[in-house]
């Protein structure tokens, strides 16, 4: 019995990263900002649960799943001028097709190489990394740009503290001309 307990804890050390203690107050505040801002609503894919769609927390904040290839969106009318995917991570409308990006700190597919200033500028300006293409609907950057710089820094610190998830989100598709 003693061997099993020791073996369990030894394996647990390899299965999970070392516990670094309580998160800093900034990371705790960042988690509050991310949760209150509803970032999981679009950046965490939905999966079908026993009571209907629910967030797939194994993919928390990883954006549109790279393995989910969508058909062309249905025709839109004035009455129905935008549609969303079943994962709630892809959206089509007059702006084209937009995909929720990977907000995890994965260096290749997420925001792992972003600097704090890139993140703040993106939210304040509505441009990818603060200088790139426009951030597309339904991302409510127009509302988030009113967050304080300290709240945006906290949100970025929190996002950089979560586990990285490798997930290459498809590129934005402009509207057909």
Task: Enumerate the language-model features and the residues they cover.
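Electron-transfer interface patches adjacent to heme c in soluble/periplasmic c-type cytochromes
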Residues: 59-118, 142-152
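The canonical Cys-X-X-Cys-His
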Residues: 30, 36-46, 119, 155, ...
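C-terminal capping alpha-helices of c-type cytochrome domains
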Residues: 113-129, 141-170
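Bacterial N-terminal signal peptides
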Residues: 6-15
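Electrostatic cytochrome c docking/interface patches
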Residues: 18-35, 47-53, 69-72, 109
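Positively charged n-region of N-terminal signal peptides that target proteins for export
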Residues: 1-5
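Acidic helix-start/capping segments at beta-turn-to-alpha-helix junctions
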Residues: 44-67, 173-176
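Surface-exposed patches in mature extracellular/periplasmic domains of secreted proteins
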Residues: 41-44, 131-136, 166-173
């Amino acid at each position: 019995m003693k061997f099993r307990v020791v073996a369990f804890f030894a394996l647990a050390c390899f299965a999970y990263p070392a516990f670094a203690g309580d998160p800093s107050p900034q990371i705790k505040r960042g988690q509050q900002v991310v949760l209150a801002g509803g970032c999981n609503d679009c950046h965490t894919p939905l999966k079908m649960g026993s009571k209907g769609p629910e967030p797939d927390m194994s993919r928390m904040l990883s954006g549109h799943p790279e393995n989910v290839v969508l058909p062309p969106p249905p025709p839109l009318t004035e009455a129905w001028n935008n549609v969303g995917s079943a994962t709630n991570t892809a959206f089509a409308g007059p702006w084209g097709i937009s995909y929720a990006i990977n907000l995890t700190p994965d260096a290749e597919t997420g925001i792992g190489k972003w600097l704090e200033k890139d993140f703040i500028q993106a939210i304040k300006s509505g441009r990818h990394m603060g200088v790139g293409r426009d951030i597309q609907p339904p991302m409510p950057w127009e509302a988030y740009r009113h967050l304080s710089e300290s709240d945006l820094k906290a949100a970025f610190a929190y996002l950089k503290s979560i586990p990285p998830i490798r997930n290459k989100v498809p590129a934005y598709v402009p509207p057909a001309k």
